[in-house]
Amino acid sequence: MKVMDALQSGRRKPLPVALLCILVTVFCVLECHGADLTSPTKKSAPLRITKPQPTSQQAKPISITTRAPTTVASTTDDEVSSSVDGQLAPLISSTTEGPSSGTTASLVPEICLNGLQLTVNSADEGTVIRKQEEFVKILEGDVVLSVLTKDPDSALFVINRVNQANLIMADFEIGIRAISIDNASLAENLLIQEVQFLQQCTTYSMGIFVDWELYKQLESVIKDLEYNIWPIPGTRAHLFPKVAHLLHQMPWGEKIASVEIATETLEMYNEFMEAARQEHMCLMHFKSDDNVYIMFGNKLASHFKENGTLFSVPTDRTDDEFLADLPNRAFVLMENEIDLSTAVELDATPTALDEILIGKSVLPSRVLSFAGSIIDLMNWLRGSLSKHCKRGEEHDLYVLESCFNFLNFIEDWRTSEYRQAHDTAEILSLLLMRKLGTAMNFQMYQKKVLTLDKITGESRTELREIASQNFVTNVTTYYHYNRDNHTSLELKTKFGQVFNCQYSAGDNRRYPFLFDGESVMFWRIKMDTWVATGLTAAILGLIATLAILVFIVVRISLGDVFEGNPTTSILLLLSLILVFCSFVPYSIEYVGEQRNSHVTFEDAQTLNTLCAVRVFIMTLVYCFVFSLLLCRAVMLASIGSEGGFLSHVNGYIQAVICAFSVVAQVGMSVQLLVVMHVASETVSCENIYYGRWLWGLLAYDFALLCCVGALIPSIYRSQRNYREGILIVIGSVLIMVIWVAWIALSLFGDEWRDAAIPLGLQASGWAVLVGILIPRTFLIVRGIERSDIAQALPSLTSLAFAQNNQYSSEQSVYECVNPAMRHCSQDEVNHQSPSEIPTLPLRGGGPRRQQFFANLRQANANINPQRPPPRPQQSPSRSSVSSLPPSPDHNKITRF
């Protein structure tokens, strides 16, 4: 009743009722929000794992574990569950797609949970998936480096020494992920996975180091990844000087033997030969009954079947299989492996080894190569920490939590010119392993097979120490020699004394040492691809040039009259024949069977002569072509009114220009040949050809080409001589482009220069052929056909056509001379008008044609003897020209 009364009273008082409803609504809304905020089924926002960005205050990284996290509560509402999954999907950042588990573990990229994986197809076991634990060794640290190498233990040892020495003076350590590369074909996949791991699973990652050989193999992939990836310097810089020194100091007999060097790569061969020359030791291959073989690498031992003295230099760790493939009494030169244990004392300062290194062995060359780059990187890191971090109050070390943007220096360090080299003693001192220097030795062993039982054939192989050289002190020690040979080592002739360089050929870096003896070198065609290309171009160009030359000679013999004197065209064709034939000296070589073949004094003279012939031909044929083009360009620019000099240069002056240009170049080339022959010991053609003096030899030819280019504005509009002006312009521009191309290519090295010079010659010849001679031949053929058609028309018998034809044949300008029309009256000559239109070639200037025009002139005199001369038609552009001067006498007509 009270409620009804209240409602009834509310009808009478609506304002209190409305206020009551608003209060009830607000209370309900607050209750609902409170329930939502305290609901156990509400999940927090998921955490996205991406590459961390440096901030002003960065906390130390938290390690990611693989155990599944527990959820706060679960919901039974399907709609809410699907909605949450839809929000999580775009936030998950992973390199590999995996099934959704519905837990926060799915927020972590799969590569962070499982690490790196390799799928290997084996013939015996099928498809095998290798886990990260099988090929990755890890030293934990706050700032991480990765290494892809064949020797992960040496890389781990270097980082251990960096942390023990605390080169960065910080309260954190450097971590490393050392990835063992057993198969080079798997390196690309592992590198890509490691980049993804460092980007998504680590907070502070500096970059990745890769073995030198792998870096060269993956260089294109590394550029595409755009990550901090650097090569580890090769170990050959530490090994090859030791090999050369031990060989030089090794006791040897008095008899010299032929030396054959076998390497896996040409780069390895060149580096060893340079190390041998530093010892002034020449290891040459020649005809001999006694042979010495020096074999580099671990892959060639099983292929060695020769008899002789063998020196084997493995570049990686050796095993029993490698030693078993070597013949008995073979010498092995390799670095000793240093065993790591708790009993090894590395330095006077007490240090410790990480547990993962106990019982392992390292190679000195690997340690020194990697340590040099790491020390320089740590110095840069310490400098960056001093700018972006604060020191702690207790230990005066840089505190990681106070650092910001301290890895930005890497962009500058990755540039090689900013790096510094460190010698061996400095590396050992900085990494607190000075006492390890006595164990870093490069040793020479000799394999000996001892027969234990003659009946069963049981044998035992041992390596007998011959000599060793220390990496730090370079002191050489010999073992057992005095006892085994019953003589003093100092009284024995050394290997380096027997194979000493007998003669040094000046500064010739290609053939620096010469020998007396029988030559083993021979002639052959080069096996390079560019030789086949150049020979093809030369043969085709020679065929085309001969075809044009035969065509012109045949047409001249038939009595055709061309625009202009064909003599220059014939000379230009002959010069092109020389251009295309000049490829022969560049396509042959004088070599031996081995790269280190014995070079005698006679061989050096032969090589010097071949080089001189190449230089002489190159400069001379360029001069022939450019001189002819220049004299034609001068003539075109000096005649007519198409923008030239408006002064005439006759054929004699053209001949003088061409002859002077050629004789000047011949004189300079002959002088060079004489100087190289007289002073062959001090002046080497190889140094000229492969050095900067080559540009001095080509300076004169380049000046002629520039002169032709300077005349382009004066000749490009000329229509004379089958539009020779524009054709010379096209040919000159093509030659200039070709010159820029081959000169640029020749700057990349000797091999590029060997190909660029002859190919540039052939391309220049084809530029003249395609730009000038082939179009001109087409215009000649077209002119001959037009002349044949014009002479076949009925108007040939008309008097007007005969007079016009007579005029066109009597032009004395620019060799437009027709011998058949020279006998004309003076009145007809005075009424001729100038014309710049090229004339048509006339067929045959024989007696029948002369009799035909004589009859026409007689008929003209009988029909109209008092005919007034026609008034010349003056064009507005040539109003100042009325007529040409009288035609010269028969014996004064000159063809240009």
UniProtKB/Swiss-Prot annotation:
**Compositionally biased residues, Low complexity:** 65-84, 874-884
Expression sites by tissue: Expressed exclusively by R8 photoreceptor cells and is internalized in a sev-dependent manner by R7 cells.
Signal peptide: which range, if any? 1-31
Q: Which residues lie on this side of the membrane: Extracellular?
A: 32-530
The protein's matches in InterPro entries, at most eight in alphabetical order, are given as: Bride_of_7less (IPR002956), GPCR_3_C (IPR017978), mGluR (IPR050726)
Q: GO:BP terms for this protein?
A: germ-line stem-cell niche homeostasis; glucose homeostasis; lipid homeostasis; R7 cell fate commitment; R8 cell-mediated photoreceptor organization; response to glucose; sevenless signaling pathway; visual perception
Keyword terms, alphabetized: Cell membrane, G-protein coupled receptor, Glycoprotein, Membrane, Receptor, Sensory transduction, Signal, Transducer, Transmembrane, Transmembrane helix, Vision
- Spell out where the chain is glycosylated: 183, 307, 474, 485
UniProt topology in membrane: Multi-pass membrane protein
Task: Give positions of region: Disordered.
Answer: 38-84, 825-844, 861-896
> Where is the sequence biased in composition, kind Polar residues?
52-64
Q: Which GO terms describe its molecular function?
A: adenylate cyclase inhibiting G protein-coupled glutamate receptor activity; receptor ligand activity; sevenless binding
Q: Does the keyword Transmembrane helix apply?
A: yes
Instruction: Identify this protein by name.
Output: Protein bride of sevenless
Q: Where in the cell is it found?
A: Cell membrane
What is the protein's known function?
A: Acts as a ligand for sevenless tyrosine-kinase receptor during eye development.
Q: Name one GO cellular component term.
A: plasma membrane
Q: What Pfam families is this protein classified in?
A: 7tm_3
**Membrane spanning stretches:** 531-554, 570-588, 615-637, 655-676, 693-712, 728-748, 759-781
- Cytoplasmic side residue ranges read 782-896
Q: Which family does it belong to?
A: Belongs to the G-protein coupled receptor 3 family.
